């Protein structure tokens, strides 16, 4: 059958797909469709597709409709067919899948590299031993729940069952055969939600991972490093415009830091901490430019009350003027594909901006800025049977980005609960106590950082890939635990600077239902006169069936 006829039939099937497949089926954030669609857009000379992830089947169908099927190379056509098949897949009303993975982690320095932050291959990247995804697909209503057998993210650093630690060899099996102890994470599921939607909209409520932005090393408003959001979101799109609205809930600082509360399961939920944001995306200049404006607030109430006047999907949140209860954050994103396969992008975020003659002329009590900027370029070039891909990205973040005292006008006390910031926690139960796994909501490395990252790789769809990468970072003294101080206006990196360098390569191959992969990395850290390094090796294999 001629190529054009095949592609025409595929396009017709896409047009009918919303009536066949469940339009509100939500892809996991890690699904390959997100990366493959970006590859197809850039190689065709289009700006990046929407960077508010994840997509639904209906949105994937909508985004594929922009592709000119008459102008596809052999490898582009292969990617298009894979995406079209995914977009039009009709799911049964109830389905259960399974994925079993075995991973081995080997490293050389067992004294200085014993936490998650000391590994290139992070906890979020590491696969559970077993994943059992359950999906319901009932037309306009869908749902998902993922049951996993996975090692917990804390524990005895001497155990082989821990994902990183003081042994040269560890694995993703949540059991220590030498001691008989199990390290199973009992806080699952981390993905569980209901969704409802149509051809150009979706509403999703529950737990899921999210990402807003084009960055590779991270994003400023919502980073993909957070294990899940307890959230509700709306996404709707038409022609060249997309609108998103999100509310996501986290433990209040009083709940986290109140030492009078029990550490057991009886520890009550106290207070309210809610992130609320909206996002506006425009595609301009014949689909070659994306312009995105995002604005959000972190709203807190120690009594756990929510004033419904706050919940307005179209409000200008900066104009609430609730400094003692809300901390606002705004961002601008822009990307431009200036020729086929080559794209440049930027992000700019404002958490705190001290401006005006009154502020600048103060002898004391000056507010530190909380700004962030990212500049990057991306390449997706078809080459023979595959795609040559790479990126180059630089990031600067102010020392106090994401941090602030409760009232925002006086320096933070030594009480960690005296804060209204963008450090968020996930409540978890580990054996005999409650812990709060805290990280930044936005950029994974937070403030006080200068980052340079780059990569170059080659990918053949459904066959194999290889990728080399470099990452360098200068990080100052400020972290999630630092109090916010007036008059501390030093630029990044502040104080004693830590230097991080990573250099590595990863590769993998797809063999039917099997995926075999591995990586080798060199990681070094330097702080004052201290210098440490580690060699890290990862091997893994995954078998999936539906």
Regions found by a protein language model. Give the residues of each.
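Boundary at the C-terminal end of the N-terminal hydrophobic targeting segment
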Residues: 19-23
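Flexible, solvent-exposed loop segments that connect beta-strands
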Residues: 114-115, 161-175, 358, 482-493, ...
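C-terminal structured domain segments
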Residues: 498-526
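Outer-membrane beta-barrel channel domains
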Residues: 24-31, 43-51, 55-58, 62-290, ...
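Signature for the C-terminal beta-barrel architecture of outer-membrane proteins
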Residues: 211, 222-431, 447-454, 459, ...
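Outer-membrane beta-barrel "beta-signal"
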Residues: 432, 509-512, 517, 532-546
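Bacterial N-terminal signal peptides
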Residues: 8-17
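Bacterial N-terminal signal peptides that target proteins for export
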Residues: 1-7
């Amino acid at each position: 059958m001629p190529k054009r006829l095949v592609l025409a039939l595929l396009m017709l099937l896409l047009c009918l797909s919303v009536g066949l497949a469940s339009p509100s089926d939500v892809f996991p954030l890690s699904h390959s469709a997100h990366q493959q669609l970006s590859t197809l857009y850039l190689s065709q000379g289009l700006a990046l597709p929407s960077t508010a992830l994840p997509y639904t089947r209906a949105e994937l169908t909508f985004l594929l409709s922009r592709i000119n099927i008459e102008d596809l190379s052999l490898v582009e056509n292969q990617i298009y067919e894979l995406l079209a098949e995914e977009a039009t897949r009709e799911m049964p009303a109830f389905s259960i899948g399974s994925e079993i993975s075995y991973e081995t982690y080997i490293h050389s320095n067992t004294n200085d590299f014993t936490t998650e932050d000391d590994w290139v291959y992070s906890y979020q990247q590491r696969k559970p031993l077993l994943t059992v995804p359950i999906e319901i697909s009932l037309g306009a209503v869908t749902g998902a729940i993922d049951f996993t057998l996975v090692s917990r993210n804390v524990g005895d650093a001497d155990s082989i069952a821990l994902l990183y630690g003081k042994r040269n060899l560890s694995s993703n099996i949540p059991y220590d055969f030498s001691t008989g102890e199990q390290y199973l994470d009992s806080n699952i599921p981390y993905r569980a939600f209901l969704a409802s939607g149509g051809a150009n909209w979706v509403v999703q409520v529950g737990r899921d991972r999210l990402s807003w932005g084009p960055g590779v090393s991270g994003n400023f408003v919502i980073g993909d490093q957070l294990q899940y959001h307890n959230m509700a979101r709306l996404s709707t799109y038409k022609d060249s415009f997309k609108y998103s609205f999100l509310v996501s809930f986290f433990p209040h600082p009083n709940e986290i830091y109140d030492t009078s509360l029990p550490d057991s399961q009886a520890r009550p939920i106290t207070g309210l901490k809610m992130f609320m944001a909206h996002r506006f995306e425009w595609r301009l200049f014949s689909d070659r430019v994306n312009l995105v404006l995002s604005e959000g607030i972190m709203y807190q109430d120690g009594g756990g009350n929510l004033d419904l006047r706050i919940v307005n999907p179209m409000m200008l949140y900066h104009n609430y003027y609730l400094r003692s209860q809300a901390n606002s954050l705004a961002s601008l994103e822009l990307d431009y594909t200036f020729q086929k396969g080559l794209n440049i992008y930027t992000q700019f975020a404002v958490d705190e901006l001290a401006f005006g003659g009154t502020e600048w002329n103060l002898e004391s009590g000056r507010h530190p800025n909380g700004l962030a900027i990212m500049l990057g370029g991306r390449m997706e070039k078809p080459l023979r049977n595959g795609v040559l891909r790479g990126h180059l990205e630089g990031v600067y973040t102010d020392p106090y980005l994401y941090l602030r005292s409760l009232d925002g006008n006086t320096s933070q006390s030594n009480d960690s609960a005296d804060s209204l910031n963008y450090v968020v926690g996930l409540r978890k139960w580990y054996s005999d106590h409650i812990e709060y796994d805290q990280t930044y909501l936005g950029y994974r490395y937070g403030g006080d950082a200068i980052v340079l990252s780059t990569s170059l790789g080659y990918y053949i769809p459904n066959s194999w890939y290889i990728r080399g990468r470099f990452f360098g970072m200068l990080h100052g003294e400020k972290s999630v635990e630092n109090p916010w101080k007036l008059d501390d206006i030093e630029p990044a990196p502040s104080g004693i600077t830590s230097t991080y360098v990573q250099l590595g390569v990863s590769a993998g191959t797809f063999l039917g239902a099997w995926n075999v992969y591995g990586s080798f990395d060199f990681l070094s850290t330097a702080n004052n006169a201290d210098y440490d390094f580690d060699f890290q090796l990862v091997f893994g294999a995954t078998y999936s069936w539906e």
